[in-house]
Amino acid sequence: MSQADLLDQDPVFQLKGSMLAVTILELAHNDLARLERQLADKVAQAPNFFRDTPLVMALDKLPEGEGRLDLPALLEVCRRHGLRTLAIRAGREEDIAAAQALDLPVLPPSGARERPLDIKDSAPRKPAEEPSPSAGEARPEPAKAEEKPADPVSRPTKVVKTPVRGGMQIYAAGGDLIVLAAVSPGAELLADGNIHVYGPMRGRALAGVKGDATARIFCQQLAAELVSIAGNYKVAEDLRRSPQWGKAVHVSLSGDVLNITRL
């Protein structure tokens, strides 16, 4: 076997699934001038957080009747403020065509996978008619099936006992994340459920990353770069204004508002 054959048997790549924290910008109005001003104000609050931030541009919430969207100009506005658009989420044909012309991936609209199937070919079947009982014949009562109580659903909990250093990312899939040590700046915690940090929280904490608005974040010392629940977040510049900065706190979500309270 030649050296070239041996090299061909050594794979040069791997395809892996990964849970990445990607910012979604949901455009509510087709008004690029207003977007430029508001985005500049937001980026000024946390310039380091928004620098080279990967972004999914969501156009599926745009109201009808606001005209054709200038997608290249929209992407340029985001680029000027450090946001790098990876993909477009859209449902309108003109937006999808514009994204494809720019060679941008197009994601399905929010909630598209949850829509019920529309099966048009199958007609409802008519139930078979049962013979009516003759006079004086008693109809037997159907037997009642015993109701079995539902088994309790337990969610797996991921426990980390060592410090989480900058550059590390820890994800608790399907459950809660408990960290029994400090979390350094630049570290990232993600969980489908709650996040508990029994030490200083100086990195990023993203709970309910798959949309669970009931998720919570608990930490003994709030000094985070970012806290997020179900996509609603606050960065360090916002958190420092809170009287709870540096204290033991509980973070919860009410509507679209993050509430930070003392433990």
Swiss-Prot record:
Biased composition regions of type Basic and acidic residues, renumbered to the chain: 112-129, 138-150
Gene Ontology annotations of biological process type: cell morphogenesis; division septum assembly; regulation of cell division; regulation of cell septum assembly
Per UniProt, what is one Pfam family of this protein? MinC_C
Q: Which UniProt keywords apply?
A: Cell cycle, Cell division, Septation
| InterPro entries, A to Z | CAP/MinC_C, MinC, MinC_C_sf, MinC_N, Septum_form_inhib_MinC_C
Q: Where is this region: Disordered?
A: 107-159
Q: Which Gene3D superfamilies match?
A: 2.160.20.70, 3.30.70.260
What family does the entry list?
A: Belongs to the MinC family.
Functionally, this protein is described as follows:
Cell division inhibitor that blocks the formation of polar Z ring septums. Rapidly oscillates between the poles of the cell to destabilize FtsZ filaments that have formed before they mature into polar Z rings. Prevents FtsZ polymerization.
NCBIfam families linked to this entry? minC
Quaternary organization: Interacts with MinD and FtsZ.
What is this protein's name? Probable septum site-determining protein MinC
Protein's organism: Pseudomonas aeruginosa (strain UCBPP-PA14)
